[in-house]
Amino acid sequence: MSACAETGGVARVADTVRLRLRITGLVQGVGFRPEVARIAADHGVAGFVLNASGAVYCEFEGPGERVAAALARLRDAPPPLARIDAIDVETTAPQGDTTFAIRHSDDATTTSARTLVSPDIAICADCLRELFDPSDRRYLHPFITCTNCGPRYTVITDLPYDRPATTMADFAMCQACADEYADPADRRYHAQTIACPHCGPTLSWYGPGGGPPVAAAAAALSGGSIVAIKGIGGYHLACRADDDAAVATLRQRKSRPAKPFAVMTADIEGARRVAEVDAAAARSLRGPAAPIVLVPARAGTLSPLVAPGLRDVGVMVAYSPVHHLLFAALGPGALVMTSANQGGSPIVYRDGDLDWIDGLADAVLTHDRPIHVPCEDSVVAIDDDGAELPVRRSRGYAPLPVGLGGAAGNRPTVLAT
């Protein structure tokens, strides 16, 4: 067997060939295996793909030029959320395969290798459209997701990345979800967090008022209450960002007299109503990480207690289905969204800590999908060239490594503890 990194030699082979690929980088939790299966189908090659602890393994078998074309497409056009660091290629003996399969993950292969885990990804445009489409079976489903979006890092309990190794393990797929999961043409093909109203997690409301949980939370917020909301990486404390009394109460309860709060709006248009959002800031707000972005506040749109004495305010846009449903019920405006904790303490993320939250919030909007890894909202500033400057690197970026770039990119990786 000989290793190679190019496809030129393969393309000249007319007979059946088989290539064994080991692909490393950010290749788990980003729809990589389904995309490999689509590539194989499009190019008429057989074989398989599977997750292993340190990589994705794939074998392509077929006429040489078809195999070469499939490899070239995989390398040049991977899934948008993936990052390929290397593809190691070996030629191996053809096995006579006639189909291509996504195999069960192999946790016995390269168990000592390090695996890049995908960060949590903001809701994609397709899922957002379906969320508010009355004809869609996931209409208003607070946990809509697909291979292109949704929680990853915060729900993964083990590797390789498969549903049994996530906090979705206890939610058995209904037949409709199972059919989508098994359909190579579906956007949810092998989407590990797939769910729907029949088989997925559910919201719960603990507070005054009845009816649907989101509607009850919206009514409480509109009335000036402070509501704890379980999100992707932990609980937020939320209140109306234009309500001086609510913001003052929140500061008193959190023992946070002056440190600025971040605010959340439904979308970019809402962000521009409360802050000066230029094109670079908008790119960050709309990106898959959906961080808090520090931008100049617009006078008179927020309570002066949100960021007292400061020119800038931290703004983020709704990044989860629950957030979008909440803003749809609330209407235009902004919410303070701050971590549910006392000053200096870690974010609350375990449902067993709800009794402790009682001293901070008037009510709780929660759900039964466990959070395995807590994750705060990331914070970035924008420099004069429009590039992000990380202030706090967490949700949407963690646990990916930081690229040093330039000459530093050739230096050894160092883990500081």
Question: What feature does the model see in each segment?
Answer:
Residues 106-417:
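Active-site-adjacent structural elements in enzyme catalytic cores
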Residues 1-193, 197-204:
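Intrinsically disordered, low-complexity, mixed-charge
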